[in-house]
Amino acid sequence: MATLIQQVESLPAAYPTAPVGLSSAVAALVKVSWQRIEPYIAWRFTPRAVTWTVEGPGEWHPPLQPATISAVEIWSGADEWEAVTVAASPLGGYCLPATGPYRFTAEVGGGVAPDIVQEAVKRLAEYLAAEPDMPGATSERTEIPGVMTSEVSRIASWRARAMQNSGAADLLRPYRRA
């Protein structure tokens, strides 16, 4: 099995459009939501350039989808990249016959984001837009003696765990692998 050494992915010119029916506060966080979701999944829905450096030998598959490979090069004994043709593998990747390293240049992304991915973007944006009940605090207790007691707590890392806590991660599970 070939080993991915490096992945250099450029930023897209734009992210997919925001789902309809969002408040202005939530819509303002759609780009941020896409920026958090894309590293979490192996699929891209807007085109951008990517370069992979791979060490062989063995079979290798692009880790991002959809991918259109435009060039494959190998590092030569002359200390420069030279164009090379590699055979297709039986499982849809590439067979790298030598150690290399190889450089794959591609464009990834395209198509329309499925409804479930758009829902994940919406859930994450809504979660991030929610105002914390207790700014700077991890717990708050309100008590009216003899009438009521209310205690609310929130872990300090609630924003860091937004992907999981919002439910977006569960929706994105099928898109984690290429």
Spans of model-derived segments:
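Extracellular/luminal ectodomains and secreted, surface-exposed scaffolds of diverse proteins
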Residues: 74-99
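Surface-exposed interaction regions enriched in Ser/Thr/Asp/Glu
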Residues: 90-118
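Generic low-complexity segments that are intrinsically disordered, proline-rich and/or Lys/Arg-biased
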Residues: 13, 17-20, 58, 63-67, ...
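Short loop/turn elements at secondary-structure junctions
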Residues: 2-6, 112-178
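Residue-level marker of positions within ordered structural domains that often coincide
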Residues: 38, 77, 109, 130
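Glycine-enriched, solvent-exposed interface loops adjoining structured elements
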Residues: 1-76
